[in-house]
UniProtKB/Swiss-Prot annotation:
Gene name of the record: Agtr2
Subunit structure: Interacts with MTUS1.
Membrane association type: Multi-pass membrane protein
GO BP term, example: inflammatory response
Extracellular side: 1-45, 105-114, 182-206, 282-294
Main location: membrane
Coiled coil: none
Biological role stated in the UniProt entry: Receptor for angiotensin II, a vasoconstricting peptide. Signals primarily via a non-canonical G-protein- and beta-arrestin independent pathways. Cooperates with MTUS1 to inhibit ERK2 activation and cell proliferation.
Protein name per Swiss-Prot or TrEMBL: Type-2 angiotensin II receptor
All ranges on the Cytoplasmic side of the membrane: 71-80, 141-159, 233-257, 321-363
Residues carrying a glycan: N4, N13, N24, N29, N34
GO CC annotation, single: plasma membrane
Entry's family note: Belongs to the G-protein coupled receptor 1 family.
Organism: Mus musculus
């Protein structure tokens, strides 16, 4: 182990693949870790606290979503099924945060053994992809509801029963490299047993760059293309609709929600994927700047943290803003929800079919 590595570098191995052993193996990019920087790890002291905060808030709001779905009587809507699975993926992702908070608290010393390292590392990756994939499904579903309202009215819940297993299978496949390579390795210089991606030494750089680019493409670029295309298509369609009075208010609400969904996804995940892409470039030898590597090491823990906050935001974007959320909450818990009371605009029964379908955004 070379003596120029800092604690911060180990953070890449929570969702990334910077190695901490076998650094002299052939096939690696020596310039990526020949830097002499050793930034302070003082900033890591705040990470566990922030992880626990996200865990508590995110777990609470997603539990409410899951409870509403499980207690809902009658047939389930396609959009409700997607929201339930999104909340479930977020819950499972958030459930891993206490372990990673402990990992940070002990300066990357994994205390839970190699099996838990492999299982929870894979669990985190699987549900991260599942959450992003279900956000994409929600975007496509809402696009269909607004652009093709008559066809969407004929949708049956059983149609979602095909999509949901497919999404979970895709998430499982995306997490297979993590399940295969994640393991505990002793880092003598740091005096820790780190939970890392233990790629073959002779191909470490290639594997690290490949996995990083895979996460960029499957976890951000492709979903963002779908999400942005769907919501800008909705915006274009609704702006062509002549709406007045309450219909216009509803239309404006939908447009704001469309923008909020796109912005939330970008704000939460763009920093992580930019740093992951830069990390891939260092492994490929395209970037050899020690300053860039230092920035990646310093910023990545907070970028990962920001990505996890998306799991806290999702219930507010897809469930809590609904016109019927207060009524659903009352029917399930049978208590007055005075803190949720506010002005609710009732849509006209004579509005166009496209505007009727906009209720899928706020229901």
């Amino acid at each position: 182990m070379k003596d120029n590595f800092s604690f911060a570098a180990t953070s890449r191995n929570i969702t990334s693949s910077r190695p901490f052993d076998n650094l002299n193996a052939t096939g690696t990019n020596e310039s990526a870790f020949n830097c002499s920087h050793k930034p302070s790890d003082k900033h890591l002291e705040a990470i566990p606290v922030l992880y626990y905060m996200i865990f508590v808030i995110g777990f609470a709001v997603n539990i409410v979503v899951v409870s509403l779905f499980c207690c809902q009587k009658g047939p389930k809507k396609v959009s409700s099924i997607y929201i339930f699975n999104l909340a479930l993926a977020d819950l499972l992702l958030l459930a891993t945060l206490p372990l990673w908070a402990t990992y940070y608290s002990y300066r990357y010393d994994w205390l839970f053994g190699p099996v838990m390292c492999k299982v929870f590392g894979s669990f985190l990756t699987l549900n991260m992809f599942a959450s992003i994939f279900f956000i994409t499904c929600m975007s496509v579903d809402r696009y269909q509801s607004v652009i093709y309202p008559f066809l969407s009215q004929r949708r049956n819940p059983w149609q979602a029963s095909y999509v949901v297993p497919l999404v979970w299978c895709m998430a499982c496949l995306s997490s297979l490299p993590t399940f295969y390579f994640r393991d505990v390795r002793t880092i003598e210089y740091l005096g820790v047993n780190a939970c890392i991606m233990a790629f073959p030494p002779e191909k470490y750089a290639q594997w690290s760059a490949g996995i990083a680019l895979m996460k960029n493409i499957l976890g951000f670029i492709i979903p963002l293309i779908f999400i942005a295309t769907c919501y800008f298509g909705i915006r274009k369609h609704l702006l062509k609709t002549n709406s007045y009075g309450k219909n216009r208010i509803t239309r404006d609400q939908v447009l704001k929600m469309a923008a909020a969904v796109v912005l939330a996804f970008i704000i939460c995940w763009l920093p992580f994927h930019v740093l992951t892409f830069l990390d891939a470039l260092t492994w490929m030898g395209i970037i050899n700047s020690c300053e860039v590597i230092a920035v990646i090491d310093l910023a990545l823990p907070f970028a990962i943290l920001l990505g996890f906050t998306n799991s806290c935001v999702n219930p507010f974007l897809y469930c809590f803003v609904g016109n019927r959320f207060q009524q659903k909450l009352r029917s399930v818990f049978r208590v007055p929800i005075t803190w949720l009371q506010g002005k609710r605009e009732t849509m006209s029964c004579r509005k166009g079919s496209s505007l009727r379908e906009m209720d899928t955004f706020v229901s």
